[in-house]
Design a protein with these regions (language model features):
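N-terminal secretory signal peptides that target proteins for export/translocation
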Residues: 1-2
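Structural detector for internal amphipathic alpha-helices that build alpha-solenoid repeat scaffolds
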Residues: 31-52, 60, 68-82, 87-91, ...
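Bacterial Sec-dependent signal peptides at the C-terminal "C-region" and cleavage site
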Residues: 16-36
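Acidic carboxylate motifs that coordinate Ca2+ or other divalent cations, activating on Asp/Glu
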Residues: 97, 195, 293
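Cyclophilin-like peptidyl-prolyl cis-trans isomerases
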Residues: 21-24, 383, 387-391, 398-633
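Bacterial N-terminal signal peptides
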Residues: 7-19
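Amphipathic alpha-helical scaffolding segments comprising HEAT/armadillo-like alpha-solenoid repeats
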Residues: 24-28, 50-63, 82-94, 113-126, ...
């Protein structure tokens, strides 16, 4: 017998955020009721079994007498993503306690086994609790089957659940590539729904890569919907991405309009991706260099790079670089473009103006010099290898060594490189790279006694010691210290002072205890201080936390488990970066600019921006964390 439905639509924002949450400056907690984890030994045991990936031990707790334990065990199994746990989880969809049913639905969705489709659909038809229903709807979106699309399209939902339906169908088609005409037609029709939250949820499908082939032949309806939108409508950000992927000349004017006039910076940045710098859109891209949003400017500069620009634009690019000495990410793109245009003197003058010890500027300088051949660039790389900054000197010496690997076929270059390596051999920060260069067979006949250098002072740079064994930063990375977490509390904050301002992150201890412990420990020990945002993709995310190499390639010597949580990847959510698979997280994390549903099954969401989202929207590559402070809460 069908149960009467209870609850309020507010749970949808917590579960999906598929509506007005998109533009919110901060988010509520995940919506999962507190279960007293930090003071409950039985619940802590479940978490520890999860970290050990003891599937049998966790499954056994699904039969526990206490509903809190059953629920915690169900949620923990989500991070295993093990299909063999589906048989044990499915009966919990009919548990007497709503929290257990909710966490079981969440886990089945994150596991994503298509065999769960029928059970989820049947549970949705009978479920009364609003929170459980929202998780059932979301879980169906991860089933990657046409049957899941059929169930979502035919489900008898309340009006306030329509955004959840559109969101899950968008995920089915856009993330998993489920080809279903009914799904496509529903989402196209819903693009012009009067409710902006439903419109936004449906539009996300058209911005996801896997969905393009399903709707490309019906693009006329997408264009009509976009043309009907107000310039402030956030749904446009997804449609302009989809149309940009089609690369159809019919859309060039349309994309130019949104790139120049959209009120949401994310829409303007997305529209830039579809503009061709070889055509009439070049003026739109050039004009965007004056956009008030730094990330729109960055997107425009990236679009300009590589284009055959007219030489008349050179003075404009020069003026921009000169007038924005601290906008290094954009300057990097424009300097690369100038190098490609053979404006060598301009680029070298910028490099020559780099002050000794300016690590951030040298990062750009060394990259830009890679586009310039010959002695002029090599002499400047050698200068960087003698910089007071150990990090700059070590990196420059490695850059010089890599250049040698590419130039060694040219006999004319041998004398130059030999002299450069010989000059650097006595500098302990550059001596490893210099020695490797001098040991090249091309220099075997030269009179130079490398053996005599054995008594040279021991090198101290990162480049020298990185091959030596060292203790991991967190030797007990897979062990939870519950006393430490109780000291942090259920809602601690991580306050990031950045080069653009203050960002405060609220952390979700109860759902991602190991992750919160890891990040808090690293912050308390000062490891995040001075670390740059090495990767920023406009309207996707800003990533930081490489405490070793600072460029995204560093590995701190430990990994931690993935902890999938019920916090959705909406704008302002903080997630752990990984090495491309579950259970490979370490120190790096990212903050999202907008909804990113494709991250749900592979990344730990462990906090959100409680204040300072306006600062996050200013962050560019090479901006940095000046300090990171943990505040218990």
């Amino acid at each position: 017998m069908r149960r009467p439905r209870l609850g309020l639509a507010v749970v949808l924002c917590a579960t999906f955020g598929a509506a007005g949450c998109e533009a919110a400056p901060s988010l509520p907690s995940s919506g999962r009721p507190a279960d007293g984890l930090l003071d409950d030994a039985e619940l802590q045991t479940v978490v520890e079994l999860g970290i050990q990936r003891d599937i049998d031990g966790v499954v056994e707790r699904l039969l526990a007498e206490r509903p809190e334990v059953r629920a915690r065990a169900a949620m923990t199994l989500a991070s295993f993503q093990a299909a063999e746990s589906v048989v044990a989880l499915s009966p919990l969809l009919d548990d007497a306690e709503a929290q257990v049913r909710r966490d079981a639905a969440f886990a089945l969705g994150r596991i994503g086994d298509p065999g769960s489709t029928g059970a989820l659909g049947a549970a949705l038809a009978e479920e009364a609790d609003a929170g459980v229903r929202s998780h059932l709807i979301e879980a169906l979106g991860h089933m990657a089957t046409e049957r899941a699309a059929d169930l979502l399209l035919s489900a008898d939902l309340e009006s306030w659940e329509e955004a959840a339906r559109a969101s899950s169908l968008s995920v089915l088609g856009g993330v998993y590539g489920v080809s279903h005409e009914g799904l496509r037609d529903y989402l196209i029709e819903t693009l012009t729904h009067e409710d902006p939250s439903i419109r936004l949820a449906a539009s996300s499908f058209f911005g996801l890569q896997s969905g393009v082939r399903l709707w490309a032949r019906h693009a006329i309806y997408v264009r009509q919907a976009l043309d009907s939108y107000d310039l402030a409508d956030p749904a446009a950000m997804h449609l302009v991405v989809g149309l940009a992927r089609l690369d159809d000349f019919l859309d060039y004017g349309r994309l130019s309009r949104w790139a120049a006039q959209a009120q949401d910076w994310r829409t303007r940045a997305n529209a830039m991706s579809g503009l061709n710098p070889l055509g009439s859109a070049v003026q739109v891209l050039v004009d965007a260099l004056a956009d008030p949003s730094p990330l729109v400017v960055f997107a425009a500069a990236r679009a300009l790079t590589g284009g055959a620009l007219d030489d008349s634009l050179v003075p404009l690019l020069e003026r921009w670089i000169e007038g924005h000495p601290n906008r290094l990410a954009v300057s990097r793109e424009l300097l690369i473009q100038l190098a490609l245009m053979r404006q060598i003197d301009v680029v070298l003058a910028w490099v020559d103006a780099t002050a000794p010890g300016d690590e951030r500027r040298w990062v750009v300088g060394l990259e830009v010099l890679s586009y310039i051949p010959g002695q002029e660039s090599l002499s400047r790389i050698a200068r960087a290898a003698r910089d007071p900054s150990e990090r700059t000197a070590a990196e420059a010496s490695l850059v010089l060594l890599r250049r040698w690997q590419g130039d060694r076929q040219s006999a004319e270059a041998h004398d130059l490189y030999f002299d450069l390596f010989r000059e650097l051999i006595d500098d302990p920060r550059a001596s490893v790279a210099a020695r490797q260069g001098l040991e090249s067979p091309e220099f075997a006949v030269r009179s130079f006694d490398l053996a005599a250098l054995g008594a040279t002072s021991a090198p101290t740079s990162e480049a020298q010691v990185k091959d030596e064994p060292s203790l991991p930063l967190l030797p007990d990375a897979q062990t939870i210290d519950w006393g430490f977490l109780r000291g942090l509390g259920n809602a601690p904050s991580l306050v990031l002072e950045t080069t653009r301002g203050t960002v405060t992150l609220q952390l979700l201890t109860a759902e991602a205890p190991l992750t919160v412990q890891t990040v808090a420990r690293l912050a308390l020990d000062g490891h995040y201080d001075g670390v740059p945002f090495h990767r920023v993709l406009p309207n996707f995310m800003a990533q930081t936390g490489d405490i070793v190499a600072r460029d995204g390639t560093g590995e701190p010597g430990f990994t931690i488990r993935t902890e999938l949580t019920q916090l959705p990847f909406e704008a302002g959510v903080v997630g752990m970066a990984n090495l491309g698979s579950l259970d490979s997280e370490n120190s790096q994390f990212f903050i999202t600019h907008s909804r990113q549903p494709h991250l749900a099954r592979g990344f730990t969401a462990f906090g959100w921006v409680s204040s300072g989202m306006d600062v996050v929207d200013l962050l560019e590559p090479l901006d940095a964390i000046l300090s990171a402070t943990v505040v218990p809460g």
